[in-house]
Amino acid sequence: MEVKMKILLDEDGIRRSITRISYEIIERNKTVDNIVLVGIKSRGDILAERIKQKLLEVENIDAPLETIDITYYRDDIDRKNFDLDIKDTEFKTNLTGKVVVIVDDVLYTGRTIRAGLDAILSKSRPAKIQLACLIDRGHRELPIRADFIGKNIPTSHSENIEVYLKELDGKEEVVIL
């Protein structure tokens, strides 16, 4: 069976989405000097770096950037057989009292974001947590919504969204399969 692929965002579309998200973060927050960006591996961290660069370009604010690996906090792993080589997230920046913007590539069920929230809240007490995602595809299983969205793409459960970024994949596009 042939898999049909449709490009949802090309390189320019991704760049424009990141620019819009960055401006929305600036507009939503009274000051951006209290913002910490937290990217979820393995594409949210790259998108967070791009937002960081845009905030620096527009507001001349060098927002701290953290990366989280949510593997330790997932709700679909068997903790008894947990791989002890997986390290818990340690933040270099104190997130307590800060406005934390979690960045991820695709928002789907909300479970990845819940794991990210657990990772952050187990270590700190931010003043506020906001969520930025490049693609919101719907189908939540948890009451989570994004504050900043690049593009809303309603999908069926049988469809997949793939985000390709130059840093990891050598190409820049978002496709639906």
Swiss-Prot record:
Substrate binds at S42, R43, D104, D105, V106, L107, Y108, T109, G110, R111, T112, R137. Gene3D superfamilies: 3.40.50.2020. It is an enzyme of class 2 (transferase). CDD domains: PRTases_typeI. InterPro entries: PRibTrfase_dom, PRTase-like, PyrR, PyrR_bifunctional. Keywords: Glycosyltransferase, Transcription, Transcription regulation, Transferase. It holds the Pfam family Pribosyltran. Its EC number is 2.4.2.9. One of its GO terms (biological process) is regulation of DNA-templated transcription. One of its GO terms (molecular function) is uracil phosphoribosyltransferase activity. It catalyses: UMP + diphosphate = 5-phospho-alpha-D-ribose 1-diphosphate + uracil. The keyword Magnesium does not apply. A motif (PRPP-binding) lies at residues 100-112. Regulates the transcription of the pyrimidine nucleotide (pyr) operon in response to exogenous pyrimidines. Also displays a weak uracil phosphoribosyltransferase activity which is not physiologically significant. Belongs to the purine/pyrimidine phosphoribosyltransferase family. PyrR subfamily. This is Bifunctional protein PyrR. It comes from Fusobacterium nucleatum subsp. nucleatum (strain ATCC 25586 / DSM 15643 / BCRC 10681 / CIP 101130 / JCM 8532 / KCTC 2640 / LMG 13131 / VPI 4355). The lineage of its organism: Bacteria, Fusobacteriati, Fusobacteriota, Fusobacteriia, Fusobacteriales. The gene is pyrR.
